[in-house]
């Protein structure tokens, strides 16, 4: 059934989803703050999708606009496809225009992003009866070669989602099964937070790439992963699963979770990353000043620290990576601390109830 879909954010992922949904026959509108980007999409009339996507070709976009109200008005599904550092700011802009019955998808939700987003909507007076849906990752590994043309390196066969609170999971699953059949709805946003694998393979391994970056050595981020980087990622992954266990959740290790998303072989993080053909050609950064630290430390690893604090457990490797990152980039955002999320005095039991409804 055709849906009226709004995409907030016209970066790599936003353009990919806009073209993908349009090619499936949905009415798609897309928002971005960049007038240059919006003009280019309007001039083209849509987005071209190439590569390893289940659908390829030119997807016609109904509207591209820098005006939030024009894009989300009347939409059934609103996909927020932006780095998590911008989710709160977008929530502020969206709050006056959201409408009863809409599904707002944090796509993806960095750990505990739904708490921050809902707090923002409340702060800015949103009274619309909406439902928040969170995904753990994007459907695609993709890059926009230029505005209006996206190359998809790989498309996942399955990935997790939930509503916030998760008591609306069954209803949402019915709505989304025809739009994103790859989604499976799971326990709650604690699980979705911990399913965010970027926190495992971005900050720690990026710190270990400092020598490459500062020596201007070109490298492919995943294909050139080293065994040492893999060991740090494995240690971070064990602490991620430890947090899940503290909340009574059965969290799959990185390798099993990754294999559920991609058809890939391997027994270690090092193996599965290097064996994923969809990652070929994805070059690594040449600076520490990138989202792999700017976003994934304060908005993912710090959120893991918050979950660990609520659960009353220690996560020394995660703490160490956060500390080193803050020494490398002195002006990192404070991030999703218990204080910033309004969770300072919340018990583990109260937080679980908040997440499940």
Please report, for each region that a protein language model flagged, where it lies by residue.
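Rossmann-like NAD(P)(H) cofactor-binding subdomain of soluble oxidoreductases
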Residues: 84-148
């Amino acid at each position: 059934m055709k849906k009226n879909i709004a995409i907030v954010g016209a970066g790599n992922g936003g353009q990919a989803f806009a073209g993908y949904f349009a090619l499936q026959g949905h009415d798609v509108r897309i928002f971005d703050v960049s007038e240059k980007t919006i003009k280019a999409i309007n001039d083209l009339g849509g987005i071209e999708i190439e590569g390893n996507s289940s659908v390829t070709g030119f997807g016609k976009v109904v509207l591209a606009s820098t005006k939030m109200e024009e894009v989300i008005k009347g939409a059934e599904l609103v996909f927020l496809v932006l780095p998590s550092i911008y989710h709160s700011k977008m929530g502020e802009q969206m709050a006056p225009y959201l409408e009863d019955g809409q599904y707002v998808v944090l796509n993806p939700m960095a750990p505990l992003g739904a708490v921050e987003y809902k707090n923002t909507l409340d702060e800015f007076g949103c009274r619309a009866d909406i439902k928040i849906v969170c995904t753990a990752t994007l459907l695609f590994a993709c890059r926009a070669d230029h505005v209006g043309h996206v190359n998809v390196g790989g498309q996942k066969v399955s990935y997790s989602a939930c509503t916030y609170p998760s008591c609306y999971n069954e209803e949402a699953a019915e709505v989304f099964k025809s739009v994103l059949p790859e989604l499976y709805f799971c326990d709650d946003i604690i699980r979705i937070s911990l399913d965010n694998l970027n926190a495992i393979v971005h900050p720690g391994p990026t710190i270990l790439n400092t020598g490459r970056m500062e020596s201007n050595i070109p490298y492919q981020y995943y294909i050139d992963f080293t065994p040492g980087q893999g060991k740090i990622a494995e240690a971070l992954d064990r602490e991620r699963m430890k947090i899940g266990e503290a909340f009574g959740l059965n969290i799959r290790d990185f390798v099993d979770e990754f294999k559920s998303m991609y058809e890939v072989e391997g027994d270690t993080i090092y193996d599965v990353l290097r064996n994923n053909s969809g990652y070929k050609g994805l070059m690594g950064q040449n600076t520490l000043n990138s989202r792999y630290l700017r976003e994934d430390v304060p908005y993912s690893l710090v959120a893991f620290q918050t979950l660990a604090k609520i659960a009353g457990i220690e996560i020394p490797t995660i703490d160490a990576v956060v500390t080193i990152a803050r020494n490398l980039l002195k002006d990192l955002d404070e991030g999703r601390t218990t204080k910033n999320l309004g969770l300072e005095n919340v018990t583990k039991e109260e937080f679980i109830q908040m997440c499940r409804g």
